UniProtKB/Swiss-Prot annotation:
Enzyme class, first EC level, given as a word: transferase
Topology of this chain in the membrane: Peripheral membrane protein
GO molecular function: glycerol-3-phosphate O-acyltransferase activity
Catalytic activities: sn-glycerol 3-phosphate + an acyl-CoA = a 1-acyl-sn-glycero-3-phosphate + CoA
Name the record gives this protein: Glycerol-3-phosphate acyltransferase
Gene name as annotated: plsB
GO CC terms, sorted: plasma membrane
Taxonomic path: Bacteria, Pseudomonadati, Pseudomonadota, Gammaproteobacteria, Vibrionales
Subcellular location field: Cell inner membrane
Length: 811
C-alpha cells in the first residue's frame, strides 16, 4: 500500500493532545483477546465504519491497552507492508455525504485476499471496531439510521459533549482465510466483506443504545386506543356501572402508575454515582459470561433478564453492570412498594415500571399491564423481572412466581417478529445489607414498609461489603423452548393477545423450573459462602483455623475437580487466602490460645451465616449426601451409594433446583467418590467404599451440610408412614411442629428448617414420585423403605427426638 499522506500524519499529531484531555473511553469487552478468542500470533487488521482520524486515534489507544497491534503500525506480510485499518464508508463533509465504500478500502481487501490465494497458511483476522460517541437512544418517529457518520463540526461537538462517554466496541473476528476458502478471492468478495461489516456496525450501535425511545404521551395514546384496552375499559364501565369517561381516566391513571419514563441523562449521571458507591462499599465486582449476552443483543434478540433476588441492591447492580458491559439498561419490573418519594421517580427514569403484588379482582389493571409489557417486547426494549416475586429471606432460591413468565409467552403469541431469549442471572454478595432484617422477619417481626428514612438508614450502614458477583447463566431461547415443548404453539398466535391455550400453564411451570435451575447453575462461590458452610457444619459453630482451611480446601477441590456446571464460578485463591479474606469482613469471633486460633460464630451470626451457606448448598448437596452415607455406614458398596442417591435425589432436585437428570447420577456418584478418594477421605477397593478413619472430621463436616435437609425429609416420611390417616394440610402442619421442636432441642438455627412452604413443596414431590396416591394417601410399600433409609442417614440422637415427637402426634 502507498505511504500515508503527510496531511493525515499532521492532522493526527495535532489531534493527540486535545484528545488526551477530552477523551476517556471504555473498551467493550475490556479483555477482547480472551473474550473474542483473538489469536495474537495471526496477523490483524481493523475495520472501522467511517473515515475519521479521531476514531482511529481513539481505537489506537484502546487496542494498545488491550495488548492488540497498533492500528497505525503497518502490517508486514511476505515482505510487503499493508495498512492495518480500513474504513467501510467515507466521512461526510458539510456539503456532501458519501456513504460508498472507499476505493482504497476495497483495494486493501482485494490485495489481502490475493495474498491468501498465494499463501495457503495465511489467515488475516479482521476485527470490526466501532467508536460510539455517547449512547443516547433516538426518539421514536426519527427516521435516521442507527449509526450515522459525523462531519467535522458534528464530530467536534460529539467529542466535547461525549468524550468521557465514549465506547470502543471490538467485535468477533472475521477470518479472511475462511472468506477466501468459502467465497473465493475476486473483487466482489471485497465488496461483500464491506457489506457484512456495515450491517455489523449498525447492530453494534443498536445493542449499545437500544431502540428509539417513545414519547410518553404518544405511548399512552397508542395503548389507550388499543383494541384490548378499549374493550377492558368498556367492561370496567359496565361491571362497575360508571361512565365510560371515568373508566378511561382510571385506565390512564393505571398506565401512569405502571409506565417507566426512561431518561438517558439520568442513567449517565446514575452511572457515576453508582461507580462511586460500589467503590466505597465493595472491594470488587466480578462479572462473568457477559459476552454471551452481548452476542444475543447484537443478533437482535429480545432479551428478558431473570435474576435471583437477594437485595434491593440488585436493581441498581444489574443495570450498572449491563451499562458498563456496553449494553442497554433494561426496563425493570419493580414492586409497587418501591414507588415512594424520592426513590420512585428516580427508579422510573432509570427504567423501572411498577407492578402490584396481585392482579386478582382487577381485570382492567391486568389488561393494561399485559398490553404495556407486550409493547415493550414489540419495540425491542430489554426487560428485567425478579421471578421469585420478592427478595429471598433465607439465601435459597425461591420457587418462581409464574405470572410474568406467562405474560412473556402471551406477548410471543401476538406474533413478535424477533426471537425472545431469557437470560438467567445469579447475583451474589459476600455481604447482603438486609440480612439482619431478614432474620428478624423470619422470627416474626413485621416487614418494614419501604420509605426514604429506611433508605437513609441503610445508606449509613454502607461499609466494607467484600466482593459482589454478577454471573450470566445459560440463556433459554423461548422460541426454541416452545418448539420443543409445544411444537404446534404458532397455531395459537392471536394479535389481540387474548389467547390462553390449554398448554400454557404446564409449559410455563416447566419453563419456570428450567429458568431457576439455570440461575442456580451460575452460582458464584466465594470466601464467605465457603467459610459459612464449614463453620455451620461444626456442632459448636467453631473450628481451629487449620481445620477451617482444610475444610474449605475440601470444598474447593470437589468443586474444581468435579465442576457443577459450565456457568458456576470459583475463586482462584487458596483456601488459606480465602479464610483470611472472610475474616477481614468482621463476621467471625477469633480467639487465640497456646495451640493457635479458633474461629467461631456467635449465636446471632450463626443465624445470619445460614443465608450465605444457602447460596451454595445446592453445589455441595450430592457430595454431602455421599459423605453422610459413608459417615453413618463406615463401609458401603458403590451400588448402595448409587441406589441411595437415586432414591433421595428427586427431593433435592425439586427443593434446590439441581441440574442433573436421573440417568446422569450413577456416573456422577463415581466421579464424586473418586475425588473423595483422591483427597484421602475414603478408600475404594473393588466395589466397596470405606471411610478413612484418620480423616473423619473433614468427611463428617462435608456430610453435615445436607444433614438438616435429610432430617426434614425424615420427619415428613416417618410422619406419613406412622399417621397414614392424616390429610396433606395436616401432614404439612404436623411436620412443621415436629421440625420446630427438633430445632429447639438440637440448636438448629436455619430459618428454612421450619418453613411451611418447604414442607408444602416436599409433599408435592412425594405425590409426583408415587409415595402418595391421587387422593393424597400414603403408599406404604414405597414410603416405608424410604422412611427407613432416611432414619439410617441421620444421627441417633436426632432420630430419637423425631420418634418421640411422632409418638406424641400419633397419640
Amino acid at each position: 500500500m502507498n505511504s500515508m499522506s503527510s496531511g493525515h500524519l499532521l492532522s493526527r499529531s495535532l489531534l493527540k493532545l486535545p484528545m488526551s484531555v477530552l477523551v476517556k473511553g471504555t473498551a467493550i469487552p475490556s479483555n477482547p483477546i480472551q473474550d473474542l478468542d483473538i489469536d495474537t500470533h495471526k496477523p490483524v487488521i481493523y475495520a472501522l465504519p467511517f473515515r475519521s482520524n479521531v476514531d482511529l486515534l481513539t481505537l489506537q489507544t484502546h487496542a494498545k491497552e488491550a495488548g492488540l497491534p497498533d492500528p497505525l503500525e503497518p502490517l508486514m506480510l511476505n515482505g510487503k507492508a499493508f495498512q492495518r485499518y480500513v474504513f467501510i464508508a467515507s466521512r461526510p463533509t458539510l456539503l456532501s455525504s458519501d456513504q460508498h465504500v472507499p476505493s482504497d478500502s476495497i483495494a486493501l481487501f482485494s490485495e489481502l485476499l490475493t495474498e491468501h490465494k498465494l499463501d495457503s497458511e495465511l489467515d488475516v483476522q479482521v476485527i470490526p471496531a466501532t467508536v460510539l460517541w455517547g449512547r443516547k437512544p433516538g426518539k421514536e418517529g426519527q427516521e435516521r439510521p442507527y449509526l450515522q457518520a459525523l462531519n467535522g463540526p458534528e464530530k467536534a461537538l460529539a467529542v466535547l459533549a461525549s468524550g468521557r462517554d465514549c465506547l470502543v466496541r471490538f467485535s468477533p473476528v472475521v477470518s479472511m482465510r475462511y472468506m477466501a476458502d468459502t467465497h473465493g478471492t475476486d473483487a466482489s468478495i471485497a465488496h461483500k466483506l464491506a457489506r457484512v461489516a456495515r450491517i455489523h456496525f449498525s447492530r453494534q450501535k443498536l445493542a449499545a443504545s437500544g431502540p428509539n425511545l417513545p414519547q410518553r404521551a404518544q405511548l399512552f395514546a397508542r395503548l389507550m386506543n388499543s383494541p384490548a384496552i378499549e374493550k377492558a375499559i368498556a367492561d370496567e364501565a359496565k361491571s362497575k356501572q360508571i361512565p365510560l369517561e371515568k373508566a378511561r381516566k382510571e385506565a390512564h391513571d393505571i398506565l401512569d402508575e405502571i409506565a417507566a419514563d426512561f431518561s438517558y441523562s439520568l442513567v449517565k449521571k446514575g452511572d457515576r454515582i453508582l461507580g462511586w458507591l460500589w467503590n466505597r462499599i465493595y472491594q470488587g465486582l466480578n462479572i462473568n459470561n457477559a459476552a454471551t449476552v452481548r452476542r444475543l443483543a447484537q443478533d437482535g434478540h429480545e432479551i428478558v433478564y431473570v435474576p435471583c433476588h437477594r437485595s434491593h441492591m440488585d436493581y441498581l447492580l444489574l443495570s450498572y453492570v449491563l451499562y458498563h458491559e456496553g449494553m442497554v439498561p433494561p426496563h425493570i419490573a419493580a414492586g409497587i412498594n418501591l414507588n415512594f418519594f424520592p426513590a420512585g421517580p428516580i427508579f422510573r427514569r432509570g427504567g423501572a415500571f411498577f407492578i402490584r403484588r396481585s392482579f386478582k379482582g382487577a381485570p382492567l389493571y391486568s389488561t393494561i399491564f399485559r398490553e404495556y409489557l407486550a409493547e415493550l417486547f414489540a419495540k425491542g426494549y430489554s426487560v428485567e423481572y425478579f421471578s421469585e416475586g420478592g427478595r429471598s429471606r433465607t439465601g435459597r432460591l425461591l420457587p418462581a412466581k409464574t405470572g410474568m413468565l406467562a405474560m412473556t409467552i402471551q406477548a410471543m403469541l401476538r406474533g413478535l417478529n424477533r426471537p425472545v431469549t431469557l437470560v438467567p442471572v445469579y447475583i451474589g454478595y459476600e455481604h447482603v445489607m438486609e440480612v439482619g432484617t431478614y432474620a428478624k422477619e423470619l422470627r416474626g417481626k413485621r416487614k418494614e414498609k419501604e420509605n426514604a428514612g429506611l433508605v437513609l438508614r441503610t445508606l449509613r450502614k454502607l461499609r466494607n461489603f467484600g466482593q459482589g458477583y454478577v454471573n450470566f447463566g445459560e440463556p433459554i431461547p423461548l422460541n426454541q423452548f416452545l418448539n420443543e415443548t409445544v411444537p404446534q404453539w404458532t397455531q395459537d398466535i392471536d394479535p389481540m393477545g387474548e389467547s390462553k391455550p390449554q398448554w400454557m400453564t404446564p409449559t410455563v411451570n416447566k419453563l419456570a423450573t428450567r429458568m431457576m435451575t439455570h440461575i442456580n447453575d451460575a452460582a458464584a462461590v466465594n470466601a464467605m459462602t465457603l467459610c459459612a458452610t464449614a463453620l455451620l457444619a461444626s456442632r459448636q459453630r467453631a473450628l481451629a483455623r487449620d481445620n477451617l482451611i482444610k475444610q474449605v480446601d475440601c470444598y474447593l477441590s470437589l468443586l474444581r475437580n468435579v465442576p457443577y456446571s459450565a456457568t458456576s464460578t470459583l475463586p482462584s485463591e487458596s483456601a488459606e487466602k480465602l479464610v483470611e479474606h472472610a475474616e477481614s469482613l468482621d463476621k467471625f469471633v477469633v480467639e487465640t490460645d497456646t495451640m493457635g486460633d479458633i474461629i467461631s460464630l456467635d449465636r446471632n451470626q450463626s443465624i445470619l451465616m445460614t443465608y450465605y451457606r444457602n447460596n451454595i448448598i445446592h453445589l455441595l448437596a450430592l457430595p454431602s449426601l455421599i459423605a453422610q452415607l459413608l459417615i453413618r455406614q463406615q463401609s458401603v458398596s458403590l451400588e448402595k451409594v448409587q441406589a441411595t442417591v437415586a432414591q433421595i435425589y428427586p427431593f433435592l432436585k425439586q427443593e434446590l433446583f439441581l441440574r442433573f437428570e436421573a440417568e446422569e447420577l450413577n456416573d456422577l456418584v463415581l466421579r464424586y467418590v473418586a475425588e473423595l478418594a483422591r483427597q484421602g477421605l475414603v478408600t475404594v477397593e473393588g466395589k466397596t467404599v470405606t471411610l478413612n478413619q484418620a480423616q473423619t472430621q473433614v468427611l463428617m463436616l462435608l456430610g453435615r451440610i445436607i444433614s438438616e435437609t435429610l432430617q426434614r425429609y425424615a420427619i415428613a416420611l416417618n410422619l406419613l408412614v406412622s399417621c397414614p390417616h392424616l390429610g396433606k394440610a395436616e401432614l404439612e402442619e404436623k411436620s412443621q411442629e415436629v421440625a420446630q421442636r427438633l430445632g429447639r432441642l438440637h440448636g438448629i438455627n436455619a430459618p428454612e428448617f421450619f418453613d411451611k412452604g418447604v414442607f408444602a413443596s416436599l409433599f408435592v414431590t412425594l405425590q409426583e414420585q408415587g409415595y402418595l396416591d391421587d387422593q393424597g394417601r400414603c403408599v406404604l410399600e414405597t414410603a416405608k423403605p424410604l422412611s427407613r433409609q432416611l432414619y439410617a442417614l441421620i444421627y441417633p440422637e436426632v432420630r430419637m427426638t423425631i420418634q418421640e415427637s411422632l409418638c406424641q402426634v400419633d397419640a
